C-alpha cells in the first residue's frame, strides 16, 4: 500500500515538473457477452452443415413405376371374352335375317312343328318357367359353379407360401379371384389373428346366388 502511494505521488510530481508531457491515456476495456459469440458460432455451424447437406444430396426426380391391378393374362382373357361376344352377336343377327328370309315351305314346317313343341312343354312340372330368362339363369349358374371351383383352388393354394404366383396359369387365377375376395376382407376378424375366414363369406354369397338361379329355372 505504501509503494502504491509513493508511485502515485512521484507521477504527480513529474507531471507538475514537466507540464508539456501528455497525460497518460487510459484505454477502456470492452467486455462482450460470451453467449453472443456462442450463438453466432452455433448459427454459422448450422448454416454450413445445412448447405453441405443440400449440396451433397442429389435431387431424386425418378417416379415410381405405375402398378396395374391386372396382368397381361387377365387382359388377354378379357379380349377373348369381348371377341366371343362380338362373334355371337354377329351370328345372332345373321340367323335373324336368315329366318326372316326363309322359303314358304320351311315356314310352313315350322308352323306345323310349333304346336307339337308346345304340347311337349305341357308335361313339365308346375312352376317351370318357359322363358328365355331360364336359359340365361342356367348359363349363369354354370358359370358360378366354375368360378366357385376356381375360387376354391385359389384359397387352397394361398396356404402354401412358396407358390410362384407370377407364373401362368397361377397369375390368371389370382387376378380373377382376388378382386372378389377383396370385397370381403376385414368383414370377419381373423381367428387367433392368423386364420382369415373371409373366404367363407364369399363362398356363401356364391352359393346363395346359385340357389336363386336354380330356383328360377323351376
UniProtKB/Swiss-Prot annotation:
Chloroplast as UniProt keyword: yes
What are the alphabetically sorted keywords of the record?
Answer: Chloroplast, Membrane, Plastid, Thylakoid, Transit peptide, Transmembrane, Transmembrane helix
Classify the main location.
Answer: plastid
Name of encoding gene: YLMG1-2
Look up and give the membrane topology term.
Multi-pass membrane protein
Give a short account of what the protein does. Not required for the biogenesis and accumulation of native cytochrome b6 in the thylakoid membrane. Not functionally involved in the pathway for covalent binding of the c-type heme to cytochrome b6.
UniProt source species = Arabidopsis thaliana (Mouse-ear cress)
Pfam families according to UniProt: YGGT
Query: Where does this one sit in the cell?
Result: Plastid, Chloroplast thylakoid membrane
Transit peptide limits: 1-83
Please identify the protein, giving its name as recorded.
YlmG homolog protein 1-2, chloroplastic
Please verify whether the record's keywords include Thylakoid: yes
Phenotype on disruption:
No visible phenotype under normal growth conditions.
Q: Which family does it belong to?
A: Belongs to the YggT family.
Task: Give the transmembrane ranges.
Answer: 133-153, 187-207
Task: Kindly list the GO CC terms recorded for this protein.
Answer: chloroplast; chloroplast envelope; chloroplast thylakoid membrane; plasma membrane
Q: Which residues form a coiled coil?
A: none
Amino acid at each position: 500500500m505504501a509503494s502504491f502511494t509513493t508511485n502515485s505521488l512521484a507521477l504527480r510530481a513529474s507531471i507538475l515538473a514537466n507540464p508539456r508531457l501528455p497525460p497518460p491515456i487510459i484505454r477502456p476495456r470492452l467486455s462482450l457477452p460470451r453467449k453472443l459469440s456462442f450463438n453466432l458460432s452455433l448459427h454459422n455451424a448450422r448454416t454450413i452443415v445445412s448447405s453441405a447437406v443440400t449440396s451433397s444430396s442429389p435431387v431424386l426426380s425418378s417416379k415410381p413405376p405405375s402398378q396395374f391391378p391386372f396382368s397381361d393374362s387377365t387382359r388377354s382373357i378379357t379380349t377373348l371374352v369381348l371377341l366371343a361376344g362380338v362373334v355371337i352377336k354377329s351370328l345372332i343377327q345373321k340367323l335373324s335375317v336368315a329366318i326372316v328370309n326363309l322359303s314358304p315351305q320351311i315356314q310352313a314346317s315350322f308352323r306345323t312343328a310349333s304346336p307339337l313343341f308346345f304340347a311337349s312343354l305341357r308335361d313339365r312340372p308346375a312352376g317351370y318357367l318357359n322363358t328365355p330368362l331360364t336359359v340365361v339363369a342356367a348359363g349363369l349358374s354354370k358359370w358360378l359353379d366354375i368360378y366357385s371351383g376356381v375360387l376354391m383352388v385359389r384359397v387352397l393354394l394361398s396356404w402354401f407360401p412358396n407358390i410362384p404366383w407370377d407364373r401362368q396359369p397361377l397369375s390368371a387365377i389370382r387376378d380373377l379371384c382376388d378382386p372378389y375376395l377383396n370385397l370381403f376382407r376385414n368383414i370377419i376378424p381373423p381367428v387367433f389373428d392368423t386364420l382369415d375366414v373371409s373366404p367363407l363369406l364369399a363362398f356363401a354369397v356364391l352359393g346363395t346366388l346359385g340357389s336363386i338361379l336354380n330356383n328360377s329355372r323351376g
